[in-house]
A protein has these predicted regions:
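Conserved pre-catalytic core of RNA-dependent polymerases
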Residues: 1-161
Length: 161
């Protein structure tokens, strides 16, 4: 990262061009889809492979391109009022802590009003690993993310290694 910062003046124009071509063509470059898989120790016996989980390490340039699209998508979702105030993920000043606080306040308010409260909790760990890509792309289309931008997401999701 330090090297990239030091060379930024020399490399920024070519990368801006690559990023713009990616957005305009609806193609996420295959070279930026390559990740290095590294084992991350969780806990317990370091000799037991079950105590590790794989993590994907992407290139800095891939992360920059992803962040640029994230900002574009978030702007679109805000502009078209697609995200509700109760949406805590991927929102500024929102987190698991604010979601928990909102939940606790809702439960307390219901109990104070003598209403019944039912909680259903789901463990969605590894949800990104199992989501059906066609369903996701169709949902984006439903929300107005169509054409070249939807193609970009399709390209992003395919041929990853």
């Amino acid at each position: 990262m330090v090297v990239i910062k030091q060379c930024l003046g020399y490399i920024i124009k070519p990368f801006v061009h690559i990023f713009n071509v990616s957005f305009q063509s609806g193609i996420f470059p295959d070279q930026m889809k390559r990740a290095k898989i590294k084992p991350l120790f969780k806990n317990g016996d370091k000799q037991n492979m079950q105590n590790y989980r794989p993590i994907s390490v992407l290139s800095v340039f891939s992360k920059i391109l992803e962040k640029l699209m994230y900002n574009r998508l978030l702007s679109f979702l805000k502009q078209h009022h697609i995200l509700t105030e109760t949406q805590h993920g991927v929102r500024e000043n929102k987190s698991t802590e604010t979601a928990s606080q909102s939940f606790i306040e809702s439960v307390q308010e219901a109990l104070d009003s003598q209403r019944k409260v039912i909680g259903i909790f789901l463990d969605l760990s590894k949800a990104y690993d199992v989501i059906n890509h066609e369903t996701l792309l169709n949902k984006l289309d439903t929300y107005g993310v169509r054409g070249i931008t939807n193609n970009w997401f399709r390209s992003y999701l395919t041929r990853r290694s």
